[in-house]
Curated annotation (Swiss-Prot):
Organism: Vibrio campbellii (strain ATCC BAA-1116)
A molecular function (GO) term: UDP-N-acetylmuramoylalanine-D-glutamate ligase activity
Function: Cell wall formation. Catalyzes the addition of glutamate to the nucleotide precursor UDP-N-acetylmuramoyl-L-alanine (UMA).
One GO biological process term: cell wall organization
Pathway the protein contributes to: Cell wall biogenesis; peptidoglycan biosynthesis
Sequence similarity: Belongs to the MurCDEF family.
Membrane-spanning residues: none
Keyword presence, Cytoplasm: yes
Record-given protein name: UDP-N-acetylmuramoylalanine--D-glutamate ligase
Catalytic EC class: ligase
Domain of life: Bacteria
Catalytic activity field: UDP-N-acetyl-alpha-D-muramoyl-L-alanine + D-glutamate + ATP = UDP-N-acetyl-alpha-D-muramoyl-L-alanyl-D-glutamate + ADP + phosphate + H(+)
Keywords, in A-Z order: ATP-binding, Cell cycle, Cell division, Cell shape, Cell wall biogenesis/degradation, Cytoplasm, Ligase, Nucleotide-binding, Peptidoglycan synthesis
Amino acid sequence: MERWQNIHKVVVVGLGITGLSVVKHLTKTQPQLTVKVIDTRATPPGTERLPEQVELHSGGWNTEWLAEADLVVTNPGIALATPEIQEVLAKGAPVVGDIELFAWAVDKPVIAITGSNGKSTVTDLTGVMAKAAGLTVGVGGNIGVPALDLLEQDADLYVLELSSFQLESTLSLKLKAAAFLNLSEDHMDRYEGMSDYRQAKLRIFDNAELAVVNRDDQETFPDTETPLVTFGSDEQAYGLEADGNRTWLLDHGQRVIASDELKLVGKHNLANALVVLALLKAADVDYHKSLNALKTYTGLTHRCQVVADNRGVKWVNDSKATNIASTIAALSGLESTGKLYLLVGGVGKGADFTPLKPIFATLNLQLCCFGADGDEFMPLHESATRFDTMEDVIQQISSQLKTGDMVMLSPACASFDQFDNFMARGDAFAALAEKYA
């Protein structure tokens, strides 16, 4: 392949899951190359899985290797502004990420998703619905399987979640369609400001045939002329139509499905579903064949996931909400006919929780505060009650639950006061739901 004509020595920076996938891809598809790995950690994960012929320099940089390299493949966690990477760029050698290598090798349609919130759900649901329509689909990138490992599946369609970090080192990824869901403050330790962060995200549109953007968030629109389609909360294009007490998902005026037919919870998830419809249509997938898959989709584990629905009471696990923005997103447009029993608390990481107060005021709410920083939530609603643990909360409220009520864990805090991680916290909630539902 022409791209590889003048490339003989490749240095992979950063091991771990992504680095290993790069090494495996290079040694398999370009066996003529000399591949070396640099990792600044003393004992990087995955060392024992490196092929014998691949040298590893760990515990610091190896500037000699970098100076000799014809190509450097860097890990998304390493900023391009890192001095050692800047030196490589200054001497004119290309620096790319694993997604760029994927772009060089892929020969089937690709769709990709970025955004500050919701991208994992959109990526996963797009894959689920495309599979239900009869396609072989490779789903991965920033979620689950590294992009290069997906190439082994020989899929009809690839669906990638891409972070801003991955997009920084991607130059030529051709996409059937690309979605930019929303933009909110994140990774400000890596970027100079919101504008810098947004520019990294916008790179997803550089070689896209169609941009799918959020009408309710103008920051998602490309700065250059790109064919685009929009989604949003009004009735245009991909949108929502309120009819009495039902809400319909629309595709350019045509009703597709009503929100009460879906297992997904929250208005933000209706927006996510609209994006999926737009992406599938752009990739020539007939989404009408897979509406059943949309109806039964419960969401990613620990993200607004319905874990029990018994006697008219929904139990929703949103343990992934480890900050205020995630909890606000989960509560916005929540459809519940009865009382919402909301479990909040854990390790607050010094956050100011007062932005939750106005949204709490709009809800028929029983606020259940637990964990190390549970006290921080007590002034935010008159119903606030203090508990030690999540189990204490469920034991106390289980006898009060009525048809139409919802019990939701969306803690706005980290979990490590009482759990190993947010997954363990979510699993504990799901087990309690099963016991008491």
